[in-house]
Amino acid sequence: MHATKAAGHRVIAVGTTAVRSLESAWDAAAPASDPAVTARGFEGREDGADVRGEGDITVREDATTNLYLMPGSTFHVVDALITNFHVPRSTLMMLVSALATRDQIIDAYEEAVREKYRFFSFGDAMLIE
């Protein structure tokens, strides 16, 4: 993740869970003095060790996150997202709205309704940049 960003490449997440996982991993590896991490609520590892600033770290496969991304959130890793059309007024809609402007989201959903796209888990997908 860090090498990809350092090389100037884009990170395109597939699914909202991937977005939250990647952004949470960045929080875990960010310098302890970074105010963006404090603002997002990073509390260190379960064992209390503060690993921030150690660069690339391995995140346990059973790790969890409480990261809530919404309009105004800063994305440090993810540049774009491929995701399905989510239910209005959901936390997933908030995450999607954090990556695009309100007008872009409204336009996409109006087209989806007009063109009879499928919604939810087995629906059509969109690319948000």
Where are these regions (language model features)?
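Surface-exposed, charge/polar-rich loops and edge strands
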Residues: 1-129
